[in-house]
């Protein structure tokens, strides 16, 4: 099994460290050819608008969209969730992949100073996670399953082979969500 990690910007190093700790072969994804032969893809947190601009600059956005729409399993955190869905009130010129049938509100939990750690039930796993300028899902299409909530906020979803979270398990050293996703591939 070879898992790609989108390494345009953001928190990809923590995801790579988790894959290495689990003994999973991985490849950094920056250009379209890096997608060839992957069994799954991790889209990390970071800044969704920068991720979008860089993916377009490297001619990666359309191949990413095609690979995901053709069934490539995806594990996404924070900005990765935003990049997969549709954004409520997007930044000027911001584009997303639109592969996940959700509408996302950016920075739903406040600014950087409002970041917090929490234990969140994700389909029976009490996951230790970090919320850092975290988004929330404000609407889901019929094919989307809600997998995690914090109060009234939807913070985890699954659609087919896409598992997406508003939070950062990797920042808290939480590996069980990665393990569950890898086992589902």
Curated annotation (Swiss-Prot):
Transmembrane segments annotated in the record for this chain: none
Amino-acid positions noted as binding L-glutamine in the UniProt annotation, renumbered to this chain: 46-48, 106, 132-133
Span of the signal peptide: none
GO cellular component, one term: glutaminase complex
Catalytic reaction annotation: aldehydo-D-ribose 5-phosphate + D-glyceraldehyde 3-phosphate + L-glutamine = pyridoxal 5'-phosphate + L-glutamate + phosphate + 3 H2O + H(+); L-glutamine + H2O = L-glutamate + NH4(+)
EC number(s) per entry: 4.3.3.6, 3.5.1.2
Pathway annotation: Cofactor biosynthesis; pyridoxal 5'-phosphate biosynthesis
Pfam families referenced in this protein's UniProt entry, alphabetically: SNO (PF01174)
GO molecular function annotation: glutaminase activity; pyridoxal 5'-phosphate synthase (glutamine hydrolysing) activity
Keyword Hydrolase: yes
Active site, renumbered: 78 (nucleophile), 168 (charge relay system), 170 (charge relay system)
InterPro entries per record: Class_I_gatase-like, PdxT/SNO, PdxT/SNO_CS
GO BP terms: glutamine catabolic process; pyridoxal phosphate biosynthetic process; pyridoxine metabolic process
Keywords: Glutamine amidotransferase, Hydrolase, Lyase, Pyridoxal phosphate
Family assignment from sequence similarity: Belongs to the glutaminase PdxT/SNO family.
Subunit structure: In the presence of PdxS, forms a dodecamer of heterodimers. Only shows activity in the heterodimer.
Database matches in NCBIfam families: PLP_synth_Pdx2
Free-text function comment from the UniProt entry: Catalyzes the hydrolysis of glutamine to glutamate and ammonia as part of the biosynthesis of pyridoxal 5'-phosphate. The resulting ammonia molecule is channeled to the active site of PdxS.
Protein name in UniProt: Pyridoxal 5'-phosphate synthase subunit PdxT
Organism whose genome encodes this protein: Corynebacterium diphtheriae (strain ATCC 700971 / NCTC 13129 / Biotype gravis)
